[in-house]
From Swiss-Prot:
Its EC number is 6.2.1.4, 6.2.1.5. SUPFAM superfamilies: NAD(P)-binding Rossmann-fold domains, Succinyl-CoA synthetase domains. The active site is at residue 281. Disruption phenotype: Viable. During development, results in delayed egg eclosion, reduced glycogen levels and extension of the third instar larval period but without change of the duration of the pupal period or final size of organ. In the adult, results in defects in locomotor activity. Results in disregulation of both glycolysis and the citric acid cycle (TCA) including accumulation of Succinyl-CoA and succinate, and reduction of GABA. It comes from Drosophila melanogaster. Residues 1-21 form a transit peptide. This is Succinate--CoA ligase [ADP/GDP-forming] subunit alpha, mitochondrial. Pathway: Carbohydrate metabolism; tricarboxylic acid cycle; succinate from succinyl-CoA (ligase route): step 1/1. GO terms for biological process: tricarboxylic acid cycle. It is found in: Mitochondrion. It comes from the Eukaryota. Belongs to the succinate/malate CoA ligase alpha subunit family. The gene is Scsalpha1.
């Protein structure tokens, strides 16, 4: 099991390098931006999860305009039209985003269908998508410049008080000035709650997921946050496994330095994790001498990031730094 995971991680690291150099897919980073007018459709709309979270999204105020269920096209669900395919839904509703609540065996096919329909933002919530399926998705992603994938195995993405796409609790979010990006769903909620409590609020929160093969990484989100004039500070939540945090540190060193640098606070989960053992997420494993928490912490601190050892202090540390910089 450990050997097969190490092999997958090597493939993943190769893909990360490929995507980093791929200007085609990088052009879709702007698709992460959401607002109150963002139109959303749902794949797996009439299933148990799709129904529950679509109802939650509607109650939050998200502009959900329809859903997809291949065998129920032409009907209505939650007062919205049901379509037989993503292509049909796109033609009728012109969505900016689709959210996927399809079971693991069919999730990759659902992503590919949305990709072929050129939906700008694809958010896959599904956990347990086979990694060999995601390799195929990754191949398709990096060869195009129309669609951006968030996930799989993630809580989703939310522009507080405007558009909620995913399973996150809406009530803890507040419109404000902090960008949050995280590999961990529950720690995302912790950061959100803390920044709400100290009065900072959030501009955009992205749960990128903890699988080895995902569609959006830290750097994709950091670029959006650094370019957004409304985002005054950033929280980055990482964990053991891979080198995404180290690459994020390199990016911040290059693009977030000097007098106009935005304050960044980070927490890295898994400090006490033993090498070779997966800790929760499929990608959370220290392998081949890489992926340890201490290496990530050192890289981020070298880039000027404030790394807190306690997840309970993320909001407090960011507020303190923003106050020092007279940003609040």
């Amino acid at each position: 099991m450990a050997a097969s995971m190490r092999a997958l991680l090597k493939v993943r690291d190769g893909f990360v390098a490929g995507v980093r150099c791929n200007s085609q897919y990088n052009k879709t980073r702007g698709n992460l931006k959401l607002n109150g007018d963002s139109r959303v459709i749902c794949q797996g709309f009439t299933g148990k999860q799709g129904t529950f979270h679509s109802q939650q999204a509607l109650e939050y105020g998200t502009k959900l305009v329809g859903g997809i269920s291949p065998k129920k096209g032409g009907t209505q669900h939650l007062g919205l039209p049901v379509f037989a395919s993503v292509a049909e839904a796109k033609k009728a509703t012109d969505p900016h985003a689709t959210v996927i609540y399809v079971p693991p065996p069919g999730a990759a096919a659902a992503i590919i269908e949305a990709l072929e329909a050129e939906i700008p933002l694809i958010v896959c919530i599904t956990e347990g998508v086979p990694q060999h399926d995601m390799v195929k998705v990754k191949h398709a992603l990096i060869s195009q410049s129309k669609s951006r994938l968030v996930g799989p195995n993630c809580p989703g993405i939310i522009a507080p008080e405007q558009c909620k796409i995913g399973i996150m609790p809406g009530h803890i979010h507040k419109r404000g000035k902090i960008g949050v990006v995280s590999r961990s769903g529950t720690l995302t909620y912790e950061a959100v709650h803390q920044t709400t409590e100290v009065g900072l609020g959030q501009t955009l929160c992205v749960g990128i997921g903890g699988d080895p093969f995902n569609g959006t990484d830290f750097i994709d989100c950091l670029e959006v946050f650094l370019k957004d004039p409304e985002t005054k500070g950033i929280i980055l939540i990482g964990e053991i496994g891979g080198v995404a945090e180290e690459k994020a540190a390199d990016y911040l060193t290059e693009y977030n330095s000097g007098i106009k640098a935005k304050p960044v606070v980070s927490f890295i989960a898994g400090v006490s994790a033993p090498p070779g053992r997966r800790m929760g997420h499929a990608g959370a494993i220290i392998s081949g001498g890489k992926g340890g928490a201490n290496d990530k912490i050192a890289a981020l601190e070298k880039a000027g990031v404030i790394v807190t050892r306690s997840p309970a202090k993320m909001g407090h540390e960011l507020f303190k730094e923003m106050k020092r910089l007279e940003l609040v």
